[in-house]
Regions:
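A conserved active-site cap/scaffold subdomain adjacent to cofactor or substrate pockets
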Residues: 142-192
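Phosphate/pyrophosphate-binding betaalpha-module
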Residues: 93, 97-160
Length: 192
């Protein structure tokens, strides 16, 4: 709320699809729940996935009913789980945007290099540029500009966003999450 008070009237900030958990669909969650319901399976996931709803339940509800859901803080923890429970299938819920793809790939390689046969990955990575295109194609409301995520942009660069101005005539600016960076990005967008 603090930044909004600093902005002149006529400028409205709208949060976009920045959280992979928030844009994880029910189909993916239903697949995860189907695995969670198996007695021979341990679901390894980040804690924020526990309350994401599927069409009929959530991981936290499945856990309350006896499913083994293990909250991890880094994907590499699946290796420890695999060794601790060799008789179980470890299914890691691999979600995220461009920023998490590298660490997931490193985990896949580490699992392969360790010869572990009981680790599986249920993957649902999202890409920011197609999400932005989908927002513009839907035209739900009017979008005058995009503040682009700095952490994703460090990985993909600025070129994948070129379509915003070329195809849609929508200005954009890459920024971090700090208040001053966001204000600078807004000023940059207004000048374009």
């Amino acid at each position: 709320e603090g930044l909004r008070q600093l902005l002149p009237s006529g400028i409205e900030l709208v949060s976009g699809p920045g959280c992979p958990v928030c844009v994880t669909d029910q189909t993916y969650m239903d697949k995860a729940l189907a695995y969670a319901e198996r007695e021979d399976t341990i679901i390894a996931t980040f804690g924020d996935m526990l309350k994401v709803p599927g069409s009929y339940s959530s991981l936290s509800e499945a856990q309350a009913k006896g499913a083994y859901i293990h909250v991890i803080y880094t994907p590499l923890e699946v290796i420890e789980l695999s060794k601790k429970y060799p008789e179980k299938k470890i299914v890691f819920l691999a979600i995220g945007f461009e920023t998490t793809i590298a660490v997931i790939c490193a985990t896949v390689k580490a699992v392969h290099d360790a010869g572990l046969k009981n680790v599986f990955f249920l993957v649902s990575h999202k890409l920011v540029p197609p999400a932005l295109r989908a927002l513009l194609d839907r035209q739900e409301g009017h979008i005058d500009g995009f503040i682009l995520p700095g952490h994703v942009s460090v990985i993909i660069g600025e070129e994948p966003y070129g379509f915003l101005s070329k195809e849609y005539g929508v200005p954009s600016c890459i920024a971090g999450f700090d208040g001053l960076e966001i204000l600078s990005a807004i000023a940059n967008i207004l000048e374009q």
